[in-house]
Amino acid sequence: VGPETLLRYCNFLGSAGVFLCAIGNEMIITLLLALVPIALLIALGAALRRREFIAASFWPQAERLGYYILLPSLFFHGLATANLDGLPVLTMVGVLVLSTVMVAGFMVVFRHRLSVSAPAFTSIFQGGVRFNNYVGVSAAAGLFGSKGIALAAVANAAIVPTVNVLCVLVFARYCNPGLFSMRKLMQQLVFNPLIAACFFGILLQVTGWGIPGAIAPLFKALGQASLPLGLLCVGAALDFSAARKWLRPVMLSSLAKFVLMPLATLLACRALGLQGQAAIAALLFQALPTASSSYIMARQLGGDAPLMAGIIASQTLLAGFAFPVAVLCLAGWV
């Protein structure tokens, strides 16, 4: 499986979009059309890596640039300049945190019924709760424009620290029970570039200071570069060879990500009264495939890194179908 398969998914999304144009459902059309360029960029990244058009050493450095500079710039500029009036920010944060904790708790409670090793469980867990930022931000921007960037930043401010805490706790419990350190956990959260960008962006928004006019275009330009480069990196990181070896764990993780997490988000939206674009954005982010950075955490903290690579590749491919289906089937209920 390679770039050709991803291109077939692009064709599927495009054909579905044309068909649904005849039906007239504006939201379905908008979502599918937003996903087509995302899928094409991922396919291009996979093709560039497979054909060795660019040196393999480029991709890790590009991921580092995106994670520490470009994506934080996007969130910082988006939050600092966005009009958040009328957006139920606190309710949206509550929905995202509650749904994430619900699914995480469910997976831990039923861990023994999965009949997998402790390292394998940590990979299944990451696949169930982590999300691919680049796909989410691109889809949100395609659906809601500049407001989508602000909603994406709010989603990150809620999910990123929650997921980091949960994943570190799970690794500490199942892989390294003697190595857990609250100090290290707090350092990870405080120095996370995405969390820091959201914090300072919200600070400038709340205080009304804004970004100084001389440097605002700098952050805007850096942010605009984050999405295409990030999606190319997602494609370059795909490794389908590992997916064939662990079909059952891959399916368990995908079930948690594409079924349990969206359903938990729907329940949280209904319980807390979140509606409209904020509810759809919350549902969108909780139906995303897992993050490629999950592989790095699995390798560094004693998880099953090969299995994690298979989960990442499989979910990214499955998302071409499962992601829009999950969002569109449940969006009418929020």
What function would you assign to each model-found segment?
Residues T5-V334:
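Alpha-helical transmembrane segments of multi-pass small-molecule/ion transporters
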